[in-house]
Design a protein with these regions (language model features):
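PLP-dependent class I/II
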Residues: 1-128
Length: 128
């Protein structure tokens, strides 16, 4: 009974071996994909007046709320809803990640690059 309760199945062990031996380089292969997405989206957003830092590597961007006092008063949750209504682009309010995220919006870079660029153009058009 102890073997059944505490050991992993042979199928799971074999799957782990395959993942570790055959797919070890897969995460590195994504580096260039996410770098291109990041750079192209940041280019569009910055050309539209967004102030964004360049993360070294991530699957998302953190976008500060515009410095406009009215927008700052709205907060990230309300402004994210506003942008969704005006642009059709869903951003995650930073406050959902804790108090340190208040005043920020998170944009996931998990869609194809062309779709992300279009989303960035729509965000720029929706901003005051």
């Amino acid at each position: 009974k102890g073997v059944v309760d505490f050991n992993q199945s042979l199928a799971l062990q074999q799957g782990a071996i395959q993942a570790l031996t055959r797919w070890a380089d897969w995460p590195r292969s994504l580096h260039g994909v996410y770098r291109e997405r990041r750079d192209r989206v940041l280019s569009v957003l910055r050309s539209g007046g967004w102030s964004c830092s360049t993360p070294e590597m991530a699957m998302y961007l953190w976008l500060p709320l515009p410095a406009d006092d009215e927008i700052q008063t709205l907060g990230d949750e309300t402004y994210a809803r506003h942008l969704l209504q005006r642009s059709g682009v869903a951003l995650t309010p930073g406050s959902g990640f804790g108090t340190g995220g208040q005043g920020w919006l998170r944009m996931a870079l998990v869609r194809p690059t062309d779709e992300l660029e279009q989303a960035a153009r729509r965000l720029v058009a929706a901003c005051p």
